C-alpha cells in the first residue's frame, strides 16, 4: 500500500529534486498534482523547477558535504536526480543510510559517466554497441583513434547535451578534439571515450518505465540532433516489428540491471531490423518532452508514478505528435517572448521554461503539436517554435 501525505503538513511526502531545469520542472508539477511536497535544488537561483517547488536551495551538487547538509535539513523521502553532475558517492552513502534515491544510487553512479554504462551494457549484459576505447591522456587518445579508425567520435566520459564531442574524420582534428573534450567534461578535464561510427537508419529514445507492476514501454521516440543536442522529436517512430521487439528487449535488460523504480530514457540506433545500444539516462529524457502532448501520461507523470510505488497499468499514445525546441541566441537577464499568439492553437501548445537568463544559445522552450502524420506534426511544431520571438 502506498501512503501519500499532504504537502506542508507534518505527514507530508517530500521529494527533493537534484537539478531543477525544464525536466525537473515537469516532475515537480506532477508531484504537486499528488499533493507531494517538492524541494528543488540546483547550482543557480531561480531555476525552472524552483518556480513550482515549495522550497529551493542553491548548492554545488558535486560537493558531497553540501549535498548531505541540504538532505539532512529537508529530510526528503525521495531524492530525484535530474542531471548527471552530482556527487554520486554521497548518494550511495545516503541510500545505505536508508534514503530512497530514484531510481537507485547505483543507476545514478553508473550512468553519470559513459564508461560505467558502456561496460555494463557491452561487457556484462553482452548487448550490441559501437566499438569503443577509453583514454585518459592525449597519447592514449591517439592510440584509441588509431585502433578504432576513421571516422570516429570522441566524447568526455562525463558530459551532457553534446558538450565536448567531436566527429573525427582525419588526424588533423586530433589535437583540437582532445582539447575540446577536456573543456567539455562536466567534472573537469579527464577521461574520454572514442567510439566507432555506427551505420544506422535512425536513432530512437525508448522511454522505459520500471514500476511495481512490471516494465512498460512508451511508443518509440524519433529525434533529430544538431551540435549534440536535440532539435525535434516525434512519436511514434516507425520501425519494423522485429526491430521494436529487439529494442524493447535491450531496454528491459538495461533497466532491470540498473535497478529501482522510475522512467529511463534508453537511446538506441536502428538499422533495418538490427538495434544497437547507445546510452541510457535513469530519468526523463529531453526528447521525451513530446509526451507532454502525445500520451495520456507524460514521461514525467510516469516517472513520478513509478518512483512513488504506484502501478502504471498502461500507457495510451494518442497518435502522431512532435516537439520542436525554442533555441534563441542572445545575452539577457530579462528575457521576453513575443508573437506567442501565433505559436498556439488547436492541437498546438508551447512550454516556456522560465530560465532566468541566457548568454549565447540556450533552450528556453518547446513547441508541441499533433497532426494526421508525424511529418505534419514535425512541421507544425517547427513552425510554432519559429513564431516565438525571443527578446532581451
Curated annotation (Swiss-Prot):
Binding-site list for N(1)-(5-phospho-beta-D-ribosyl)glycinamide: 22-23, 82, 286, 355, 362-363
Family, similarity comment: Belongs to the PurK/PurT family.
Pathway(s) annotated for this protein in UniProt: Purine metabolism; IMP biosynthesis via de novo pathway; N(2)-formyl-N(1)-(5-phospho-D-ribosyl)glycinamide from N(1)-(5-phospho-D-ribosyl)glycinamide (formate route): step 1/1
Subunit structure: Homodimer.
Entry keyword set: ATP-binding, Ligase, Magnesium, Metal-binding, Nucleotide-binding, Purine biosynthesis
Catalytic activities: N(1)-(5-phospho-beta-D-ribosyl)glycinamide + formate + ATP = N(2)-formyl-N(1)-(5-phospho-beta-D-ribosyl)glycinamide + ADP + phosphate + H(+)
GO BP annotation list: 'de novo' IMP biosynthetic process
MF-aspect GO terms: ATP binding; magnesium ion binding; phosphoribosylglycinamide formyltransferase 2 activity; phosphoribosylglycinamide formyltransferase activity
Name under which the protein is recorded: Formate-dependent phosphoribosylglycinamide formyltransferase
Function: Involved in the de novo purine biosynthesis. Catalyzes the transfer of formate to 5-phospho-ribosyl-glycinamide (GAR), producing 5-phospho-ribosyl-N-formylglycinamide (FGAR). Formate is provided by PurU via hydrolysis of 10-formyl-tetrahydrofolate.
E.C. number: 6.3.1.21
Chain positions recorded as ATP binding sites: 114, 155, 160-165, 195-198, 203
Residue numbers binding Mg(2+): 267, 279
Xref: SUPFAM superfamilies: Glutathione synthetase ATP-binding domain-like, PreATP-grasp domain, Rudiment single hybrid motif
Cellular component GO terms, alphabetical: cytosol
The ATP-grasp domain, residue ranges: 119-308
InterPro entries membership: ATP-grasp, ATP-grasp_carboxylate-amine, ATP_grasp_subdomain_1, PreATP-grasp_dom_sf, PurT, PurT/PurK_preATP-grasp, PurT_C, Rudment_hybrid_motif
A matching Pfam family: ATP-grasp
Group of enzyme by EC: ligase
Amino acid at each position: 500500500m502506498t501512503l501519500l501525505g499532504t504537502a506542508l503538513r507534518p505527514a507530508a511526502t517530500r521529494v527533493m529534486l537534484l537539478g531543477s531545469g525544464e525536466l525537473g520542472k515537469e516532475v515537480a508539477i506532477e508531484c504537486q498534482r499528488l499533493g507531494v511536497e517538492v524541494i528543488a535544488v540546483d547550482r543557480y537561483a531561480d531555476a525552472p523547477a524552483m518556480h513550482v517547488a515549495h522550497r529551493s536551495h542553491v548548492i554545488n551538487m558535486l560537493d558531497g558535504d553540501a549535498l548531505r547538509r541540504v538532505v539532512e535539513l529537508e529530510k526528503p523521502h525521495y531524492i530525484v536526480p535530474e542531471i548527471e553532475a552530482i556527487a554520486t558517492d554521497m548518494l550511495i552513502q545516503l541510500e545505505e543510510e536508508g534514503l530512497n534515491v530514484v531510481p537507485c544510487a547505483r543507476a545514478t553512479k553508473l550512468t553519470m559517466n559513459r564508461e560505467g554504462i558502456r561496460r555494463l551494457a557491452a561487457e556484462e549484459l553482452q548487448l550490441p554497441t559501437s566499438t569503443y576505447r577509453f583514454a585518459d591522456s592525449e597519447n592514449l587518445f591517439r592510440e584509441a583513434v588509431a585502433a578504432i579508425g576513421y571516422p570516429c567520435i570522441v566524447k568526455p566520459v562525463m558530459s551532457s547535451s553534446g558538450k565536448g564531442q567531436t566527429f573525427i574524420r582525419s588526424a588533423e582534428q586530433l589535437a583540437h578534439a582532445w582539447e575540446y573534450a577536456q573543456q567539455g567534461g562536466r567534472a573537469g578535464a579527464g577521461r574520454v571515450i572514442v567510439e566507432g561510427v555506427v551505420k544506422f537508419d535512425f536513432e530512437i529514445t525508448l522511454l522505459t518505465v520500471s514500476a511495481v507492476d512490471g516494465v512498460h514501454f512508451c511508443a518509440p521516440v524519433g529525434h533529430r540532433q544538431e551540435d549534440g543536442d536535440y532539435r525535434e522529436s516525434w512519436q511514434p517512430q516507425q520501425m519494423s516489428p522485429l526491430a521494436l521487439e529487439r529494442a524493447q528487449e535491450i531496454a528491459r535488460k538495461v533497466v532491470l540491471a540498473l535497478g529501482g523504480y522510475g522512467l529511463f530514457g534508453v537511446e538506441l540506433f536502428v538499422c533495418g531490423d538490427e538495434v544497437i545500444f547507445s546510452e541510457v539516462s535513469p530519468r526523463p529524457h529531453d526528447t521525451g518532452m513530446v509526451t507532454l502532448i502525445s500520451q495520456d501520461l507524460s514521461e514525467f507523470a510516469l516517472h513520478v508514478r513509478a518512483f512513488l510505488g504506484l502501478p502504471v497499468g498502461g500507457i495510451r499514445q494518442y497518435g502522431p505528435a512532435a516537439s520542436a525546441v525554442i533555441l534563441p541566441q542572445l545575452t539577457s537577464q530579462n528575457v521576453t517572448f513575443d508573437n506567442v499568439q501565433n505559436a498556439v492553437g488547436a492541437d498546438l501548445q508551447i512550454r516556456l521554461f522560465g530560465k532566468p537568463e541566457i548568454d549565447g544559445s540556450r533552450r528556453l522552450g518547446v513547441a508541441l503539436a499533433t497532426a494526421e502524420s508525424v511529418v505534419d506534426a514535425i512541421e507544425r511544431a517547427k513552425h510554432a517554435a519559429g513564431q516565438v520571438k525571443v527578446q532581451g
